[in-house]
Curated annotation (Swiss-Prot):
Its cofactor is pyridoxal 5'-phosphate. Belongs to the class-III pyridoxal-phosphate-dependent aminotransferase family. HemL subfamily. Keywords: Cytoplasm, Isomerase, Porphyrin biosynthesis, Pyridoxal phosphate. The gene is hemL. The keyword Zinc-finger does not apply. Pathway: Porphyrin-containing compound metabolism; protoporphyrin-IX biosynthesis; 5-aminolevulinate from L-glutamyl-tRNA(Glu): step 2/2. This is Glutamate-1-semialdehyde 2,1-aminomutase. The keyword Magnesium does not apply. Homodimer.
Protein backbone atom coordinates (compact mmCIF):
# COMPACT_ATOMS: atom_id res chain seq x y z
CA UNK A 1 0.00 0.00 0.00
CA UNK A 2 1.13 3.55 -0.71
CA UNK A 3 0.87 6.39 1.79
CA UNK A 4 2.09 9.38 -0.19
CA UNK A 5 -0.79 11.66 0.82
CA UNK A 6 -0.47 10.71 4.50
CA UNK A 7 3.27 11.50 4.37
CA UNK A 8 2.55 14.91 2.89
CA UNK A 9 -0.10 15.67 5.49
CA UNK A 10 2.20 14.59 8.32
CA UNK A 11 4.95 16.89 7.06
CA UNK A 12 2.49 19.80 7.04
CA UNK A 13 1.17 18.89 10.50
CA UNK A 14 4.68 18.86 12.00
CA UNK A 15 5.02 22.54 11.12
CA UNK A 16 2.10 23.62 13.30
CA UNK A 17 1.37 20.75 15.75
CA UNK A 18 4.02 19.43 18.20
CA UNK A 19 5.23 16.16 16.71
CA UNK A 20 2.55 16.44 14.05
CA UNK A 21 -0.11 14.81 16.24
CA UNK A 22 -2.46 15.69 19.08
CA UNK A 23 -1.78 12.50 21.05
CA UNK A 24 1.77 11.06 21.05
CA UNK A 25 1.12 7.40 20.19
CA UNK A 26 -0.36 8.45 16.84
CA UNK A 27 3.07 9.60 15.61
CA UNK A 28 4.34 6.02 14.99
CA UNK A 29 7.52 6.76 16.97
CA UNK A 30 7.37 3.31 18.60
CA UNK A 31 7.13 1.48 15.27
CA UNK A 32 8.74 3.86 12.79
CA UNK A 33 7.30 5.19 9.59
CA UNK A 34 4.66 7.78 8.85
CA UNK A 35 1.30 7.87 10.63
CA UNK A 36 -1.81 7.11 8.62
CA UNK A 37 -4.19 10.03 8.11
CA UNK A 38 -7.80 8.90 8.14
CA UNK A 39 -10.35 10.35 5.75
CA UNK A 40 -13.42 8.39 6.81
CA UNK A 41 -14.60 5.23 8.53
CA UNK A 42 -17.65 3.01 8.28
CA UNK A 43 -18.46 -0.17 10.14
CA UNK A 44 -15.26 -2.16 10.68
CA UNK A 45 -13.19 -0.23 8.15
CA UNK A 46 -10.98 2.83 7.93
CA UNK A 47 -10.38 4.69 4.67
CA UNK A 48 -7.21 6.76 4.60
CA UNK A 49 -6.24 9.83 2.60
CA UNK A 50 -4.50 7.64 0.01
CA UNK A 51 -7.63 5.60 -0.65
CA UNK A 52 -6.52 2.51 1.26
CA UNK A 53 -9.13 0.41 3.07
CA UNK A 54 -8.05 -1.00 6.44
CA UNK A 55 -9.73 -3.39 8.87
CA UNK A 56 -9.67 -1.44 12.13
CA UNK A 57 -8.69 -3.02 15.44
CA UNK A 58 -8.17 0.26 17.30
CA UNK A 59 -11.75 1.50 16.95
CA UNK A 60 -10.85 4.89 18.40
CA UNK A 61 -9.20 3.06 21.33
CA UNK A 62 -12.38 1.24 22.24
CA UNK A 63 -15.65 3.16 21.89
CA UNK A 64 -16.75 1.86 18.50
CA UNK A 65 -18.40 -1.25 19.94
CA UNK A 66 -20.99 -1.17 17.14
CA UNK A 67 -18.66 0.04 14.41
CA UNK A 68 -17.77 3.40 12.91
CA UNK A 69 -20.52 5.80 11.82
CA UNK A 70 -23.19 3.66 13.48
CA UNK A 71 -26.33 5.09 11.92
CA UNK A 72 -28.47 5.70 15.04
CA UNK A 73 -25.57 7.63 16.59
CA UNK A 74 -24.97 9.64 13.42
CA UNK A 75 -28.67 10.47 13.10
CA UNK A 76 -28.93 11.51 16.75
CA UNK A 77 -25.97 13.88 16.47
CA UNK A 78 -27.22 15.46 13.24
CA UNK A 79 -30.69 16.09 14.64
CA UNK A 80 -29.35 17.50 17.89
CA UNK A 81 -26.85 19.77 16.13
CA UNK A 82 -29.73 21.44 14.30
CA UNK A 83 -31.06 22.59 17.67
CA UNK A 84 -27.78 23.99 18.98
CA UNK A 85 -24.37 22.60 19.82
CA UNK A 86 -23.68 23.95 23.31
CA UNK A 87 -25.69 25.83 25.92
CA UNK A 88 -23.85 25.63 29.23
CA UNK A 89 -27.27 24.94 30.74
CA UNK A 90 -29.15 21.79 31.80
CA UNK A 91 -31.00 19.75 29.18
CA UNK A 92 -33.54 16.95 29.49
CA UNK A 93 -31.28 14.53 27.63
CA UNK A 94 -28.65 14.69 30.40
CA UNK A 95 -31.17 13.24 32.84
CA UNK A 96 -32.30 10.60 30.36
CA UNK A 97 -28.81 9.26 29.67
CA UNK A 98 -27.93 9.46 33.37
CA UNK A 99 -30.98 7.37 34.27
CA UNK A 100 -30.14 4.87 31.53
CA UNK A 101 -26.53 4.51 32.69
CA UNK A 102 -27.59 4.09 36.32
CA UNK A 103 -30.05 1.37 35.29
CA UNK A 104 -27.34 -0.53 33.40
CA UNK A 105 -24.43 -0.38 35.84
CA UNK A 106 -24.51 -2.13 39.25
CA UNK A 107 -23.97 -0.30 42.52
CA UNK A 108 -24.31 3.30 41.32
CA UNK A 109 -27.04 5.79 42.20
CA UNK A 110 -25.84 8.98 40.53
CA UNK A 111 -23.52 9.92 37.69
CA UNK A 112 -21.74 13.15 36.71
CA UNK A 113 -20.77 13.79 33.10
CA UNK A 114 -17.46 15.37 32.13
CA UNK A 115 -15.52 15.64 28.86
CA UNK A 116 -12.92 12.86 28.89
CA UNK A 117 -11.72 9.78 30.70
CA UNK A 118 -8.82 11.80 32.09
CA UNK A 119 -11.23 14.31 33.58
CA UNK A 120 -13.41 11.52 34.98
CA UNK A 121 -10.50 9.84 36.77
CA UNK A 122 -9.10 13.15 37.99
CA UNK A 123 -12.50 14.12 39.42
CA UNK A 124 -13.01 10.69 40.98
CA UNK A 125 -9.74 11.02 42.90
CA UNK A 126 -10.67 14.49 44.14
CA UNK A 127 -14.06 13.18 45.25
CA UNK A 128 -12.46 10.23 47.04
CA UNK A 129 -10.05 12.53 48.86
CA UNK A 130 -12.86 14.85 49.87
CA UNK A 131 -15.09 12.01 51.04
CA UNK A 132 -12.41 10.20 53.07
CA UNK A 133 -10.48 13.32 54.13
CA UNK A 134 -7.26 11.56 53.14
CA UNK A 135 -4.64 12.49 50.55
CA UNK A 136 -2.83 9.42 49.23
CA UNK A 137 -3.90 7.09 46.45
CA UNK A 138 -2.67 3.74 45.20
CA UNK A 139 -2.36 3.12 41.47
CA UNK A 140 -0.82 0.19 39.64
CA UNK A 141 2.31 0.21 37.49
CA UNK A 142 1.32 0.08 33.83
CA UNK A 143 -2.26 1.20 34.38
CA UNK A 144 -3.17 4.42 32.59
CA UNK A 145 -5.83 6.75 33.93
CA UNK A 146 -5.24 9.76 31.70
CA UNK A 147 -2.60 12.45 31.78
CA UNK A 148 -3.51 14.14 35.06
CA UNK A 149 -0.40 14.67 37.20
CA UNK A 150 -1.42 12.18 39.89
CA UNK A 151 -1.54 9.36 37.36
CA UNK A 152 1.70 9.88 35.43
CA UNK A 153 3.67 7.69 37.82
CA UNK A 154 4.74 4.55 35.91
CA UNK A 155 1.76 4.96 33.60
CA UNK A 156 0.95 2.62 30.75
CA UNK A 157 -0.32 3.42 27.25
CA UNK A 158 1.49 6.20 25.41
CA UNK A 159 3.62 7.05 28.44
CA UNK A 160 5.38 3.69 28.47
CA UNK A 161 5.39 3.54 24.67
CA UNK A 162 7.66 6.58 24.67
CA UNK A 163 9.82 5.32 27.51
CA UNK A 164 8.78 8.09 29.90
CA UNK A 165 6.24 6.62 32.34
CA UNK A 166 7.14 9.35 34.84
CA UNK A 167 6.56 12.69 33.15
CA UNK A 168 8.60 15.85 33.73
CA UNK A 169 6.31 18.53 35.07
CA UNK A 170 4.84 16.30 37.78
CA UNK A 171 5.89 17.84 41.09
CA UNK A 172 7.58 15.88 43.86
CA UNK A 173 4.70 16.68 46.19
CA UNK A 174 2.15 15.23 43.78
CA UNK A 175 4.26 12.13 43.22
CA UNK A 176 4.56 11.51 46.97
CA UNK A 177 0.79 11.20 47.27
CA UNK A 178 0.65 8.52 44.56
CA UNK A 179 1.72 5.11 45.84
CA UNK A 180 2.68 2.56 43.22
CA UNK A 181 1.57 -1.08 43.44
CA UNK A 182 2.23 -4.14 41.28
CA UNK A 183 -0.74 -5.28 39.23
CA UNK A 184 -2.05 -8.69 40.32
CA UNK A 185 0.07 -8.62 43.51
CA UNK A 186 -2.26 -8.45 46.51
CA UNK A 187 0.54 -8.81 49.06
CA UNK A 188 2.25 -5.74 47.63
CA UNK A 189 -0.97 -3.76 48.09
CA UNK A 190 -1.29 -4.98 51.69
CA UNK A 191 2.26 -3.80 52.40
CA UNK A 192 1.52 -0.33 51.03
CA UNK A 193 -1.64 -0.04 53.09
CA UNK A 194 0.15 -1.10 56.28
CA UNK A 195 2.95 1.39 55.67
CA UNK A 196 0.45 4.23 55.11
CA UNK A 197 -2.24 3.32 57.62
CA UNK A 198 -5.14 5.76 57.66
CA UNK A 199 -3.68 7.94 54.89
CA UNK A 200 -4.99 6.28 51.72
CA UNK A 201 -8.14 7.72 50.17
CA UNK A 202 -8.52 5.41 47.20
CA UNK A 203 -7.17 2.56 45.15
CA UNK A 204 -7.71 3.15 41.44
CA UNK A 205 -7.34 0.32 38.96
CA UNK A 206 -8.15 -0.78 35.45
CA UNK A 207 -9.95 -3.93 36.58
CA UNK A 208 -8.97 -5.37 33.22
CA UNK A 209 -5.77 -3.59 32.26
CA UNK A 210 -5.78 -2.29 28.71
CA UNK A 211 -2.75 -0.04 28.56
CA UNK A 212 0.07 -2.58 28.86
CA UNK A 213 -1.69 -4.85 26.46
CA UNK A 214 -4.77 -6.64 27.74
CA UNK A 215 -4.05 -8.10 31.17
CA UNK A 216 -6.85 -9.79 33.12
CA UNK A 217 -7.04 -9.70 36.91
CA UNK A 218 -5.73 -12.84 38.60
CA UNK A 219 -8.29 -15.02 40.34
CA UNK A 220 -9.21 -13.46 43.66
CA UNK A 221 -7.29 -10.23 43.01
CA UNK A 222 -10.26 -7.89 42.65
CA UNK A 223 -12.09 -9.48 45.58
CA UNK A 224 -8.92 -9.09 47.62
CA UNK A 225 -8.78 -5.39 46.78
CA UNK A 226 -12.46 -5.04 47.68
CA UNK A 227 -11.85 -6.67 51.07
CA UNK A 228 -8.77 -4.54 51.80
CA UNK A 229 -10.61 -1.34 50.91
CA UNK A 230 -13.62 -2.22 53.05
CA UNK A 231 -11.42 -3.13 56.02
CA UNK A 232 -9.36 0.06 55.81
CA UNK A 233 -11.92 2.72 54.88
CA UNK A 234 -10.44 3.10 51.39
CA UNK A 235 -12.58 3.76 48.31
CA UNK A 236 -12.12 1.32 45.42
CA UNK A 237 -12.24 3.04 42.03
CA UNK A 238 -12.69 1.01 38.85
CA UNK A 239 -11.44 2.84 35.78
CA UNK A 240 -13.87 1.54 33.15
CA UNK A 241 -12.94 4.00 30.43
CA UNK A 242 -12.07 1.03 28.19
CA UNK A 243 -14.15 -1.75 29.74
CA UNK A 244 -17.39 0.05 30.55
CA UNK A 245 -20.32 -0.99 28.31
CA UNK A 246 -17.87 -3.13 26.31
CA UNK A 247 -17.11 -6.24 28.35
CA UNK A 248 -20.65 -6.46 29.69
CA UNK A 249 -23.78 -4.34 29.88
CA UNK A 250 -22.78 -3.40 33.43
CA UNK A 251 -19.03 -3.44 32.86
CA UNK A 252 -16.49 -5.27 34.99
CA UNK A 253 -18.62 -5.00 38.12
CA UNK A 254 -21.16 -7.22 36.38
CA UNK A 255 -18.51 -9.40 34.72
CA UNK A 256 -16.68 -10.28 37.93
CA UNK A 257 -19.37 -9.63 40.53
CA UNK A 258 -17.21 -7.14 42.44
CA UNK A 259 -18.61 -3.78 43.57
CA UNK A 260 -16.49 -0.65 43.27
CA UNK A 261 -17.15 2.51 45.28
CA UNK A 262 -16.60 4.84 42.33
CA UNK A 263 -16.60 3.96 38.63
CA UNK A 264 -15.20 6.09 35.82
CA UNK A 265 -16.27 5.98 32.18
CA UNK A 266 -15.24 7.44 28.84
CA UNK A 267 -15.18 6.53 25.15
CA UNK A 268 -18.21 4.20 24.81
CA UNK A 269 -20.49 6.36 26.94
CA UNK A 270 -20.14 9.15 24.36
CA UNK A 271 -20.61 7.03 21.26
CA UNK A 272 -17.25 8.27 20.02
CA UNK A 273 -17.69 11.92 20.97
CA UNK A 274 -15.63 13.50 23.79
CA UNK A 275 -17.35 12.36 26.99
CA UNK A 276 -16.36 11.02 30.36
CA UNK A 277 -18.33 10.30 33.51
CA UNK A 278 -17.89 9.15 37.07
CA UNK A 279 -20.51 7.49 39.22
CA UNK A 280 -21.02 6.12 42.72
CA UNK A 281 -23.61 5.50 45.38
CA UNK A 282 -25.58 8.52 46.58
CA UNK A 283 -23.70 9.26 49.80
CA UNK A 284 -20.45 9.66 47.87
CA UNK A 285 -21.86 11.59 44.91
CA UNK A 286 -23.65 14.02 47.23
CA UNK A 287 -20.22 15.30 48.29
CA UNK A 288 -20.01 17.01 44.89
CA UNK A 289 -20.90 20.68 44.44
CA UNK A 290 -23.51 22.09 44.47
CA UNK A 291 -24.67 19.63 47.16
CA UNK A 292 -21.33 19.14 48.86
CA UNK A 293 -17.90 20.73 49.28
CA UNK A 294 -15.97 18.91 46.50
CA UNK A 295 -15.82 21.19 43.48
CA UNK A 296 -16.03 19.93 39.90
CA UNK A 297 -17.31 21.82 36.88
CA UNK A 298 -17.09 22.12 33.10
CA UNK A 299 -18.62 24.41 30.49
CA UNK A 300 -19.02 21.58 27.99
CA UNK A 301 -19.97 18.87 30.49
CA UNK A 302 -23.21 17.27 29.35
CA UNK A 303 -23.09 19.06 26.00
CA UNK A 304 -26.03 18.09 23.77
CA UNK A 305 -24.08 16.48 20.93
CA UNK A 306 -22.17 14.14 23.21
CA UNK A 307 -25.29 13.30 25.19
CA UNK A 308 -27.21 12.51 22.00
CA UNK A 309 -24.45 10.22 20.73
CA UNK A 310 -24.05 8.55 24.10
CA UNK A 311 -27.76 7.98 24.59
CA UNK A 312 -28.10 6.40 21.14
CA UNK A 313 -25.13 4.14 21.85
CA UNK A 314 -26.28 3.03 25.31
CA UNK A 315 -29.83 2.46 24.06
CA UNK A 316 -28.52 0.15 21.36
CA UNK A 317 -26.42 -1.80 23.88
CA UNK A 318 -29.32 -1.97 26.33
CA UNK A 319 -31.84 -3.14 23.73
CA UNK A 320 -29.69 -5.83 22.13
CA UNK A 321 -28.33 -7.96 24.97
CA UNK A 322 -26.84 -10.42 22.45
CA UNK A 323 -24.21 -7.88 21.37
CA UNK A 324 -21.87 -8.96 24.15
CA UNK A 325 -22.32 -12.63 23.26
CA UNK A 326 -21.48 -11.89 19.63
CA UNK A 327 -18.42 -9.89 20.64
CA UNK A 328 -17.23 -12.75 22.84
CA UNK A 329 -17.71 -15.30 20.06
CA UNK A 330 -15.99 -13.20 17.41
CA UNK A 331 -13.02 -12.40 19.62
CA UNK A 332 -12.67 -16.03 20.70
CA UNK A 333 -12.65 -17.01 17.01
CA UNK A 334 -9.93 -14.45 16.29
CA UNK A 335 -7.90 -15.59 19.30
CA UNK A 336 -8.04 -19.23 18.20
CA UNK A 337 -6.99 -18.31 14.66
CA UNK A 338 -4.05 -16.17 15.78
CA UNK A 339 -2.93 -18.90 18.18
CA UNK A 340 -3.08 -21.49 15.42
CA UNK A 341 -1.04 -19.62 12.80
CA UNK A 342 1.59 -18.22 15.17
CA UNK A 343 2.22 -21.70 16.58
CA UNK A 344 2.45 -23.12 13.06
CA UNK A 345 5.08 -20.50 12.22
CA UNK A 346 7.08 -21.16 15.41
CA UNK A 347 6.61 -17.65 16.79
CA UNK A 348 7.23 -17.06 20.50
CA UNK A 349 4.09 -15.32 21.75
CA UNK A 350 1.40 -14.97 24.39
CA UNK A 351 -2.22 -13.98 23.76
CA UNK A 352 -4.23 -12.31 26.51
CA UNK A 353 -7.96 -11.77 26.16
CA UNK A 354 -10.99 -10.71 28.15
CA UNK A 355 -14.20 -10.50 26.14
CA UNK A 356 -13.70 -8.21 23.15
CA UNK A 357 -10.30 -6.94 24.33
CA UNK A 358 -7.26 -8.89 23.13
CA UNK A 359 -3.50 -8.43 22.78
CA UNK A 360 -0.58 -10.34 21.28
CA UNK A 361 2.70 -10.23 23.21
CA UNK A 362 5.91 -11.45 21.58
CA UNK A 363 7.18 -13.21 24.66
CA UNK A 364 6.63 -16.70 26.07
CA UNK A 365 4.75 -15.22 29.01
CA UNK A 366 2.75 -15.36 31.08
CA UNK A 367 2.06 -11.61 30.84
CA UNK A 368 0.46 -10.61 34.13
CA UNK A 369 1.76 -7.13 34.98
CA UNK A 370 3.82 -4.17 33.82
CA UNK A 371 7.17 -5.94 34.25
CA UNK A 372 6.21 -8.98 32.20
CA UNK A 373 4.47 -6.86 29.55
CA UNK A 374 7.71 -4.91 29.07
CA UNK A 375 9.61 -8.13 28.23
CA UNK A 376 7.99 -8.40 24.80
CA UNK A 377 10.16 -8.29 21.67
CA UNK A 378 9.57 -4.80 20.30
CA UNK A 379 11.51 -5.44 17.09
CA UNK A 380 9.24 -8.36 16.25
CA UNK A 381 6.23 -6.18 17.03
CA UNK A 382 7.44 -3.52 14.59
CA UNK A 383 7.66 -6.12 11.81
CA UNK A 384 4.24 -7.43 12.82
CA UNK A 385 2.66 -3.98 12.79
CA UNK A 386 4.05 -2.88 9.42
CA UNK A 387 3.41 -6.27 7.85
CA UNK A 388 -0.24 -6.18 8.86
CA UNK A 389 -0.55 -2.59 7.69
CA UNK A 390 0.64 -3.59 4.22
CA UNK A 391 -1.95 -6.39 4.24
CA UNK A 392 -4.76 -3.96 5.11
CA UNK A 393 -5.07 -4.63 8.84
CA UNK A 394 -4.61 -1.74 11.28
CA UNK A 395 -3.63 -2.41 14.90
CA UNK A 396 -2.33 0.08 17.46
CA UNK A 397 1.17 1.40 16.66
CA UNK A 398 2.43 0.29 20.07
CA UNK A 399 3.19 -3.06 21.67
CA UNK A 400 1.53 -1.81 24.85
CA UNK A 401 -1.98 -1.36 23.53
CA UNK A 402 -5.05 -3.57 23.35
CA UNK A 403 -6.98 -4.54 20.22
CA UNK A 404 -10.69 -3.74 20.38
CA UNK A 405 -13.21 -5.87 18.51
CA UNK A 406 -16.38 -4.37 17.07
CA UNK A 407 -19.70 -6.01 16.34
CA UNK A 408 -19.40 -4.68 12.78
CA UNK A 409 -16.58 -7.15 12.03
CA UNK A 410 -17.67 -10.13 9.95
CA UNK A 411 -16.18 -13.61 10.11
CA UNK A 412 -14.79 -12.91 6.64
CA UNK A 413 -12.93 -9.93 8.15
CA UNK A 414 -11.62 -12.15 10.94
CA UNK A 415 -10.46 -14.81 8.47
CA UNK A 416 -8.76 -12.12 6.39
CA UNK A 417 -6.97 -10.92 9.53
CA UNK A 418 -5.89 -14.42 10.55
CA UNK A 419 -4.57 -15.09 7.04
CA UNK A 420 -2.69 -11.77 7.09
CA UNK A 421 -1.10 -12.70 10.43
CA UNK A 422 -0.14 -16.08 8.99
CA UNK A 423 1.53 -14.43 5.99
CA UNK A 424 3.34 -11.79 8.05
CA UNK A 425 4.55 -14.15 10.78
CA UNK A 426 6.18 -16.39 8.17
CA UNK A 427 8.67 -13.54 7.59
CA UNK A 428 9.88 -13.30 11.21
Amino acid sequence: MLYKRSSQLFAEAEKVIPGGVNSPVRAFKAVGGTPIFVKSAKGAYLYDEDGNKLIDYINSWGPMVLGHAYQPVVDAVIEKAKLGTSFGMPTELETEIAALAVSMVPNIDKIRFVNSGTEACMSAIRLARGFTKRDKIIKFAGCYHGHSDSFLIQAGSGAVTFGSPNSPGVTEGTAKDTLLAKYNDLENVKTLIEANKGEIAAIIIEAVAGNMGCIPPAEGFLQGLRDLCTANGILLIFDEVMTGFRLARGGVQELYGIDADIVTFGKVIGGGLPVGAFAAREEIMNYLAPLGPVYQAGTLSGNPLAMAAGYAMLKALDNDREIFTRLEEKTAYLEAGIDRVLKANNVVFTINRVGSMISVHFDAGPVTDFKTAAKGDNETFKKFFHGLLQEGVYIAPSAYETWFITDALTYEDLDFTINAIDKVSKTF
